Swiss-Prot record:
This is Shikimate dehydrogenase (NADP(+)). Keywords: Amino-acid biosynthesis, Aromatic amino acid biosynthesis, NADP, Oxidoreductase. Its EC number is 1.1.1.25. It comes from Methanococcus maripaludis (strain DSM 14266 / JCM 13030 / NBRC 101832 / S2 / LL). It catalyses: shikimate + NADP(+) = 3-dehydroshikimate + NADPH + H(+). Homodimer. The gene is aroE. HAMAP family: Shikimate_DH_AroE. Belongs to the shikimate dehydrogenase family. The active site is at 70 (proton acceptor). NADP(+) binds at residues 130-134, 222, 245. Pfam families: SDH_C, Shikimate_DH, Shikimate_dh_N.
Length: 278
């Protein structure tokens, strides 16, 4: 029951009606029997500053930020975590002592989803497909302990991102980059961060051919609708282990949840709540 002591968290973006975040967060809240509620707010860019001020005034515990505000929100925050600053995007804000503090949990969400399948990720050869916003967070996190190659249809964009991450992480060996015609046979992990294959455009060619994939490779697609996008169907044909975007969605959400509440939510409860709605 909502009352004067209910703690508020939520999602800010445009649009937000497609989001599964309220479903999984409220499922975790119900499971833990804590007096929180998670709401989704459709917010235009010109209102971002007022929304941050309003969240402080109404004593929100925090909120998630989704497309298209992950970068623009940063100028209205009081503090930004060093990783989020380096990534150049924020997806989680905590309100504490009247201050709005920004974090980015997208990269750690992918890492945790992968480690659920592979164990600890160290010195793996990882191929990242795409160089957009999702790729930035994922590449930054995974490049800390692994050997990354970023590829994109526009090679210049892949080059720029790889050089930026190498510089920010002070990498002794710079990240590699290339085009979509890359030889994939030596990669342990391949991650698609592009929207190719997302509903409703599901009947498309995989973003890169996978016929030369390493026998024991792990292939991940950040898409979660459909649950098995064309990229993963193709990877499975060649014997790869596959992971869809549900894992990333849930784990990044779980890290956000813990930032706000100080409590680790049940990953299974969150995942089950989403799958039941797809």
């Amino acid at each position: 029951m909502i009352n004067s002591k209910t703690k508020l968290v939520g999602l800010i973006g445009h649009p937000v009606d497609h989001s599964f975040s309220p479903i999984m967060h409220n499922a975790a809240i119900k499971d833990l029997k804590i007096n929180y509620r998670y709401f989704a707010f459709d917010v235009s860019e010109e209102n971002l500053k007022d929304v941050v001020a309003g969240a402080k005034a109404f004593n929100f515990r925090g909120f998630n930020i989704t497309i298209p505000h992950k970068m623009n929100i940063m100028k209205y925050l009081d503090e930004i975590d060093c990783d989020a600053e380096a990534i150049g995007a924020v997806n989680t804000v905590k309100i504490e002592n009247g201050k709005a503090i920004g974090y980015n949990t997208d990269g750690i969400g992918v890492k945790k989803a992968l480690e659920e399948k592979t164990g600890i990720l160290i010195n793996k050869n990882i191929l990242i497909i795409g160089s957009g916003g999702a790729s930035r967070a994922v590449s930054f996190e995974l490049a800390k302990d692994n050997n990354l190659t970023i590829v994109n249809r526009n090679i210049e964009k892949a080059e720029n991102l790889s050089k930026e991450i190498s510089r920010k992480l002070k990498k002794e060996n710079p990240l590699n980059y290339g085009g979509l015609d890359i030889n994939i046979e030596n990669f342990d992990i391949i991650i698609n961060t592009t929207p190719v294959g997302m509903y409703p455009h599901t009947e498309v060619e995989p973003v890169i051919p996978l016929n030369n994939i390493k026998k024991d490779a792990v292939v991940m697609d950040l898409i979660y609708n459909p649950l098995e996008p064309v990229f993963l169907k193709e990877a499975k044909k060649y014997g790869a282990k596959t992971i869809n975007g549900i894992g990333m969605l849930v784990y990044q959400g779980a890290v956000s949840f813990e930032i706000w509440t100080g409590i680790k939510p049940d990953i299974f409860v969150m995942k089950k709540s989403i799958i039941s709605k797809i």
